[in-house]
Amino acid sequence: MNVNSSAFERTNRFPSFPVLKDDQKTSSDSIAAAKKKDLLSLISSKSLLSSETLGWFSVICAFSITGSGLEVNTMSIPFYLIFGIFAFVSFTTQYLGIYSFSFQPFQLLNVIIASLSMVFITLGAFVLGTLDTTCLLLLAFKLFFIRNDPTPFNARSANLKNYIAFPICLFVINHILILLGYFQCSYSVFYASVFYILLGVFIRVFYLVNKEKFEKKELAFLFSSIVVACLIQFNVLPLGTINLSVTRFTILCFMQIFCINWDGIARIQFYLGKFDISLIMALISAIINKTASQNSIKIISCLYQVGFCFFKIGSSITANLKLPDNSRIYRLYNDFIVNGVLADKESRSIFYFFLLNVSYMFVQVIYGLWTNSLGLISDAIHMAFDCIAILVGLVATTLAKMPLNYAYPFGFAKIEALSGFTNGIFLVLISFSIVGEALYRLFHPPQMNTDQLLLVSFLGLVVNLVGILAFNHGHNHDHGSHHHHSHSNHSMCLPNTTNDINIFEEFEEEKDNVEAQKMGYTNDDHVSQHEHTHENSQEHHHEHNHNHDHIHKYNEKCDHESISLQNLDNDHHCHHHHENHNMHGIFLHIIADTMGSVGVIVSTILIQWFSWTGFDPLASLIIAALIFVSVLPLIKDSAKNLLSVTDPESEYLLKQCLSNISLSNSVISLSNPKFWTNERGEVYGILHIQVSIDGDLNVVRNEVFRKLSIAVPNLKHICIQSERPNNCWCGK
């Protein structure tokens, strides 16, 4: 009784920790899993990273960044340069199908339309504030979509009053500020900005409607817009050149990628109360943004305007964020990050280094904006390209691990070679650009400020050294050549099977099992025999026999004959060039950055000692030469891999072996020999043989397989199809 009472007291004292039985634990685990699934679905369905919401938010941020005073040093950007950059962005995004849902077909006319629209709105947003630009956008959209209404203002007065009243208030405020001299802008520039924004919106929405009905109007309106663009370019109209910082203009260009998709703007319902405190604060922020002299106050007012536009004006979008494409974001994150990058130790280390690189890049950007240092911002932009290269390598690593399928029976391993080749070409272009800039600076030495170079270069060197350590001391297990010699009286087994080959074997066996379940007995009407011989660490071959004179049960166990190569004598030399071109390319990027940091440190010290700025271009020339020399082997090897080239040694052995096989009495001819070497030095091949009537198909095929296995020790996979004369499906 005492034991039971004490147990009762314990269970009452700690009621939240009951002792569960096995079935209760299983039920509890299932409930926890269900709750976790519901939470993940909630996160994925309520994600802010949907195409519509992200596009709307990017539009607002683009306007804010355009008109904010984040940097003092600016550069003059002409109209043609703005149009050229936006044309490139529009062409790339529409050609690749990125955030271009409003343009169904890819046409050059659509690229021009999107480019003109983005240029006009950028010019207008450069002068006006975030609220002004956003409200004019919404007003233009609404006026366009009710243009065919017989009584638009009577029928839709309740909806239009906010769209019209708020821009009128901002218009009056801007006029008063210009009159008082607080808003440093002329009336002509102000009116031109309003006109540009309206024109950009009308160009954009004209091509959202039925093209058959408004085809002539579209062409006429487009021609008028091109005329306006030409007048701006030749400074007949204002804002032919705008003064923007490099950072703001670069961020603006990236923002415009998401700004292409504006379908959600047409569905925004703008409801504001007469005495809404947020409305009053928005008008005050517009006044502060025009009159404040300190950048910090302007930034605070811009942030409030972004929040007001996104959550108040765009409330009809933010109130319903459950869009169908949100689940794909979580699925992409789970497949790429969790099951792809983080599942492998090597790629996980590179991913952590990528996060460190991105973090350091943002630190450089923030500190560069804070101190107005062009050197820090330039180095951050350079590091951004390195982050892109590392990200491409990580994507290639994940895609290369995708399972085989019927469409890609040899897998996706060549993606790594393609990534390595791309990174190699990119490094060659970088080395050429460094040489050109260094030669110019060598003969035209600029004035250099070396106060912050040592600190920035030292921090960059530390980050790159961490990246080298992430590769396990230079990625020594993947780079370099590994030589294996096999002579007589030595074991002659093939290398261990890689994951790709295991997957392929399982893929073939699974296909056979599916066919076995579908078919019980077969009775073929023709004489044909098709064998596939697969060689892996277990050295087995797989046969499929179809003969008209017997019945073969598919549910019987298939015959797997093991061919042991342990006691075979061979005096050939086997060479394996074991290299991952993708990781090699990433590693060379880190090495190039490391050499750059070291070069900057050494040149900075020499400049401070001898006061000659020529040490900087000399160090750049040495670094460019080292990058060029180190990247050539990567380009050469990855190009051979992409072209499916057989290495010279294996090619010589294959020619000798195939020549000996062709002399056999049972072999009439050999056709379609295709052999190639992958990046691990393993040989793959396909071969058709025609066997005489006197020869046995199985015996001849096994003999061919045995001879090839002995002659080419690094033969990994060979598919041999043995046929009777004049009975091959390929016509040989």
Swiss-Prot record:
Question: Gene Ontology terms, cellular component aspect?
Answer: cytoplasmic vesicle; endoplasmic reticulum membrane; Golgi apparatus; Golgi membrane
Question: Would I find Magnesium among this entry's keywords?
Answer: no
Q: Does the keyword Acetylation apply?
A: no
Q: Which GO terms describe its biological process?
A: intracellular zinc ion homeostasis; zinc ion import into Golgi lumen; zinc ion import into organelle
Q: Which compartments does it reside in?
A: Endoplasmic reticulum membrane; Golgi apparatus, cis-Golgi network membrane
What InterPro entries does UniProt report for this protein, alphabetically?
Answer: Cation_efflux (IPR002524), Cation_efflux_TMD_sf (IPR027469), Msc2-like (IPR045316)
Please list where the region (Disordered) is annotated.
Answer: 526-547
Q: What is its main location?
A: endoplasmic reticulum
Alphabetically sorted, this entry's keywords are: Endoplasmic reticulum, Golgi apparatus, Ion transport, Membrane, Transmembrane, Transmembrane helix, Transport, Zinc, Zinc transport
Q: Which positions, given as ranges, span the membrane?
A: 52-72, 79-99, 111-131, 163-183, 189-209, 219-239, 240-260, 268-288, 350-370, 380-400, 415-435, 453-473, 586-606, 615-635
Q: Which domain of life is it from?
A: Eukaryota
Topology relative to the lipid bilayer, per the entry, is: Multi-pass membrane protein
Gene Ontology MF terms: zinc ion transmembrane transporter activity
Question: How is the quaternary structure described?
Answer: Interacts with zrg17.
Q: Which PANTHER family match?
A: PTHR45755, ZINC TRANSPORTER 7 (PTHR45755:SF4)
Q: Which family does it belong to?
A: Belongs to the cation diffusion facilitator (CDF) transporter (TC 2.A.4) family. SLC30A subfamily.
**What does it do?**
Probable zinc transporter involved in Golgi membrane trafficking through the regulation of zinc homeostasis.
Indicate what this protein is called per its UniProt record: Probable zinc transporter cis4
Biological source species: Schizosaccharomyces pombe (strain 972 / ATCC 24843)
Lineage of the source organism?
Eukaryota, Fungi, Dikarya, Ascomycota, Taphrinomycotina
Gene assigned in the entry: cis4
